[in-house]
């Protein structure tokens, strides 16, 4: 497990040796195997995309990880079946965040934890691509919730807020590598820009990368712990 996963999973999450974990909105399984290793736990990765689940299964390590199709708004698990629901960067994709929070509550056993990593509106100015792609700012302001609003959604579903912490994570070792990553098209906000806006942003980013010494690129993420 790489250091990023260790930093994310360690400080805010309780020990869960030999327990049950859900990686909700697991995508291609970036964290699923890491969760199983970190907690020595049974982990179920759930995602609505068959294509992403196929990629996740290709990365599967060992017998303690399995995958199932489903959504946060309709979690395909019985009540009182897991100890931790882990959600990474899915909140802004949820069609019905309040319903998703309500779905989490009964699935958790007594004392269970919902852990959410999310981009929030307060952090937009610190996102490394915003200055290069100014058309992304109004989109981010529309799709990202405020920190307090995220907390209120889960509180309304019966959770209490245990912790909210800002984590700054390295996402690329240099601006040049960051530009390559953005060009791959994984960011849904940039994918929604016009071709002209995207090309102009990439040109500006490449120009900046050529002028500066190699330096890592970081972005802020808010971590929420609910019980």
Stretch-by-stretch model annotation:
Residues 86:
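A conserved beta-strand element that flanks and buttresses the S-adenosyl-L-methionine
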């Amino acid at each position: 497990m790489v250091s990023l996963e260790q930093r994310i999973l360690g400080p805010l999450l309780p020990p869960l040796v030999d327990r049950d974990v859900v990686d909700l909105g697991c995508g291609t399984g970036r964290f699923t195997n890491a969760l199983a290793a970190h907690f020595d736990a049974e982990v179920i990765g759930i995602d609505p995309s068959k294509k992403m689940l196929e990629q996740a299964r290709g990365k599967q390590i060992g017998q303690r990880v399995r995958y199932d199709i489903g959504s946060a708004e309709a979690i395909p698990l019985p009540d009182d079946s897991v100890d931790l629901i882990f959600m990474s960067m899915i909140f802004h994709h949820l069609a019905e965040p309040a319903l998703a929070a309500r779905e989490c509550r009964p699935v958790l056993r007594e004392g269970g934890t919902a852990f959410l990593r999310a981009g929030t509106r307060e952090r937009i100015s610190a996102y490394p691509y915003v200055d290069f792609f100014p058309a992304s700012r109004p989109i981010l302001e529309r799709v990202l919730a405020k920190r307090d609003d995220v907390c209120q959604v889960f509180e309304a579903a019966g959770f209490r807020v245990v912790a909210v912490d800002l984590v700054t994570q390295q996402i690329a070792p240099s601006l040049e590598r960051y530009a390559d990553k953005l060009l791959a098209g994984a960011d849904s906000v940039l994918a929604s820009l016009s071709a002209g806006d995207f090309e102009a942003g990439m040109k500006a980013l490449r120009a900046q990368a050529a002028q500066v010494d190699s330096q890592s690129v970081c972005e802020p993420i808010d971590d929420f712990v609910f019980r």
